[in-house]
């Protein structure tokens, strides 16, 4: 999905999450379309130390 793509394209957490407006923003809201549970867990752990 676009969330994973953001990171694989070299985006960082600021870019990919962008305070709730980036392609990974949905991860923060509970894994809707474009982010699987495992993707979000990995990204959130990477970005926020397991938040």
From Swiss-Prot:
Q: What are the annotated GO cellular component locations?
A: extracellular region
Keyword Disulfide bond appears in the UniProt entry: yes
Keywords assigned by UniProt, alphabetized:
Disulfide bond, Pheromone, Secreted
Q: Which cysteines are joined by disulfide bonds?
A: 3-24, 6-16, 13-47, 27-40, 35-51
Gene Ontology MF annotations: mating pheromone activity
Protein location: Secreted
The principal localisation class reads secreted
Mind telling me which InterPro entries this protein's record contains?
A: Pheromone_Er2/Er23_protoz (IPR016057), Pheromone_Er23_protoz (IPR016056)
Q: What does this protein do?
A: Mating ciliate pheromones (or gamones) are diffusible extracellular communication signals that distinguish different intraspecific classes of cells commonly referred to as 'mating types'. They prepare the latter for conjugation by changing their cell surface properties.
Q: What is this protein called?
A: Mating pheromone Er-23
Native species of this protein?
A: Euplotes raikovi
